[in-house]
Amino acid sequence: MPISRERFAQGLTAQEFIDKMTKNQERFQENLEKTTAIFTDEDRVFFAEHPVSIAAIGEDWCTDVIQFLPVGIKLAEAFDLPLRIFLRDENLDLIDQYLKEGKYRSIPVFVLYDSDWNELGYFTERPDSVTQDMAKESRRFALENSDLEGVNRAYENMPDETRAKIRENSSRFRWDNMLEWNRRCVDELKQIAASATAGATR
């Protein structure tokens, strides 16, 4: 069943989500502070003309949520857009409507609605271009660190030390590119919102 206005109203506010966090709070707050800088005057005009409501699904243990949920939160804050957040593991009926590739409960999810509560579309996990960048970096790291034991094996079959080095590199690469990738997230949300008309209900 789609997220009704009534169900939407039962979601967490951004502050309520933050207050419930038990993991990754410091990184999340840092991302919130930095994300404000990615918005433009063009974004302000766009969302004035295409106001939307945003339902987000996430969990604090997920790295993609820690990176991209702050984008949705700051977008809503900057442009006065209604936003509610639902914990994935407590709302499986919701996440199961937005499965990645029809089978994965990937998060975050952003679902956008117009003023008449028509669903305009949704964003899942991360921009495809970011996934491509991450895969390219993984290949580069494996090639330049071929001396690491098992570096070309499936991740779950790698020795612990190799997995640790890969995680360290992936984390560095992600946060080095955070603002650019967050900007791509904004652009994808704008593409979804483009079919909305003025006059969204607050």
Language-model-derived ranges and their functions:
Residues 1-52, 77-82, 88, 96-106, ...:
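Non-globular targeting/processing and membrane-anchoring segments
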Residues 37, 65-67, 93-94:
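Short amphipathic alpha-helical surface micro-motifs
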Residues 43-74:
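Local sequence-structure signature of Cys/Sec-based thiol-disulfide redox active-site neighborhoods
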Residues 60, 90-95:
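Structural microenvironment flanking redox-active thiols in thiol-disulfide oxidoreductases
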